[in-house]
Amino acid sequence: MVVKKSKPKNQIRVEDLDLPKLNTSKNPQTKIQKKGKKKGKIFAETKDDLQNILNQVTYELDDKIKSKLQVAHEREAVFSKQSDRKISNNKADKKTGRKNEKK
């Protein structure tokens, strides 16, 4: 039996198709860091530079702490107002002789 060899079909290269490349971007969101270099490490050459860096970090941390304290004080003020209202309502009910009715 004789086997015919088929002619190769038209072979088109991928580069000729003008298809977009997958998984590539000009601005990747994550950068690959080389081993041995730590992220965010800053070296200070003089003591003044070191003090400036430390002052900047403490200032940022103080802002975070202050904002948390402000939120806590606001919440405390709201809760104290609500509890004052409940206490005053209970005192008024006792004076008039009414009981709280639950529906």
From Swiss-Prot:
Ranges of Basic residues composition bias in the record: 1-10
Domain of life assignment: Eukaryota
GO term, biological process aspect, one: ribosomal large subunit biogenesis
GO cellular component: nucleolus; preribosome
Name this polypeptide is given: Uncharacterized protein C1751.04
Region listing for Disordered, in residue ranges: 1-38, 77-103
